Swiss-Prot record:
One Gene Ontology biological process: rRNA base methylation
TRAM domain sequence ranges: 1-62
Chemical reaction(s) catalysed: uridine(1939) in 23S rRNA + S-adenosyl-L-methionine = 5-methyluridine(1939) in 23S rRNA + S-adenosyl-L-homocysteine + H(+)
Annotated catalytic residues: 406
Ligand binding ([4Fe-4S] cluster): 75, 81, 84, 163
Keyword Iron-sulfur belongs to the record: yes
Protein family membership: Belongs to the class I-like SAM-binding methyltransferase superfamily. RNA M5U methyltransferase family. RlmD subfamily.
Record keyword Iron-sulfur present: yes
Name recorded for this polypeptide: 23S rRNA (uracil(1939)-C(5))-methyltransferase RlmD
Primary enzyme class: transferase
Residue numbers binding S-adenosyl-L-methionine: 271, 300, 305, 321, 349, 370
Amino acid sequence: MPVAGPLDIVSLDGEARGIGRLTNEDGTPGKVVFVEGALPGERVMYRSHRVKPSYEQAGVVNILRQSASRVTPQCKFFGVCGGCSMQHLDSRAQVAIKQRVLEDDLWHLAKLRPDVVFRPIAGPDWGYRYRARLTVRHVAAKGGVLVGFHERKSSYVADMTSCEVLPPHVSALLVPLRELVGRLSIVQRMPQIELAVGQDVTALVLRNLEPITAEDEAELRAFADHHNIQFWLQPKGPDTVYPFYPLDRTLTYTLPEFGITMPFKPTDFTQVNHQINRVLMSRALKLLDAQPGDRLLDLFCGIGNFTLPMATRAREVMGIEGSEALTTRALANAQHNGLHTKTSFACRNLFEVSADDVAALGKFDRWLIDPPREGALAVSKALAELSQSGGDAADLLPKRIIYVSCNPATLARDAGLLVHEAGYRLAGAGVVNMFPHTSHVESMAVFERD
C-alpha cells in the first residue's frame, strides 16, 4: 500500500494503537485508522496493511508532530517482540491512558461514573514480571533454538537475547536456555517453558512432549546447579507437573504487612507483579474495612491470595474457587499460616452460580471478588435477583463489595448489574498498573449498598 497522511492521532485503542479518523470528500467523518506505533497528539504519515469498509489497520512511516509523552524504548527488541506494546510512551502517560480506558468503559458500557476515582497503584516499570510463558522453537534459519515471546501479531518467536520486563537474573538466562535446549534430545518436542519466580526460588517448567533421556537429565541438573534454578517437568496436561531437580526447594511469595507466606506451584495462578500485589492487597483490605466480628466472602479465591489477609482482619472468611487443585492449595496455605481455624474453602463453578446458590451460603458482611477476564456475570445476576426478591433474600446481600478486575469491559458490564439492578452504588474505582508497558488494564472498584 502507498504511504498516506497526514493523520492526526486522537487516542489509543485497547491494543495501544493510535486512533485517527479520515475525512470524506464532503467533509463528513470517514473511516477510522488504527496506527501501530502512533501516540495521541501526534500527526503521522502511515501505510495501511489492512483495509476494510469502515476502518484501516496501519503502521507509522513518519512522525510529523511528536507527542511530548513519547520516549525511547528501553528494550532493543521493542516493536518486534509482542510482549510489550507501550514502551514508547512515558510510564505516567501509560497509567493515565489506562485510567481513561477504565472510566470510558464504565460510562459507555454501564452509564456509570464512580463517586471517587482512586489514585492509581503503580510500582517498578522494569524487571517486574515474575511469571511468564516462553515459547520454544527450533529454527534452523535463525541458527538454532529461540526462547522468548511471540513476535507482534505473529506465531513466530522473537529472536530475543534479553527482556527488560523479566527480572534481570531471568533475562540473563535467555541465551543459556537457548543453548541448553539445543543440546537436549527433545529439542523438537519442547514447545514452551513456563517461568515462576518466588521469594528465594526461580522455577522453570519444561513442557516435554517426550520423556527425557539420562543425558538430558544430566544436562538439566548441571544447568540448575550453575544458574541456581529449579526445573519442573510437564509431560502432559497441567496436572502432570512435577519437580525434577532440585527437590528441596519451595516457591513462595510473602505479604509482609499481614505476616503471610504463600507457598505455590509454578503453574498456579499468582499475580505477575509481586510488588504491586502487596500494594493492591493493602488498599483492598483498607477499602473492605472489615471489622473483627465480620464474616467475609472471597470469590475466585485461587490459592488464598486475598482470603488469608482477610482472615487477619475478621472473625471468619470463606473462599470459593472453581479449581479443586487451587482449593486444596488454599486450604494448605491457611494451615501453613495458622489461619485454618478462621477460614474455609469450597470448590464451586462461579460461572454458573444462581441466586439460590448464593442464598444457601448465608449472610456475609463484605465480599471480595477477583474473577478472571470473563468477569463475574453469574454472581452479579444472582445478587440482582436477590435484591429484586426483597425481604429476607435481599438481607443476604453484603453491604460492601471489592471487585478486583483484569478486564475493564467485563467489570463495567457487571457494575451495571450491581448498580442498576442490585441496588449498589459505585463508590470508587481506579487502575492498578500490574503490567507496565502493556495495554493490559487491571483495576479495582468498590460497591456499597445502604
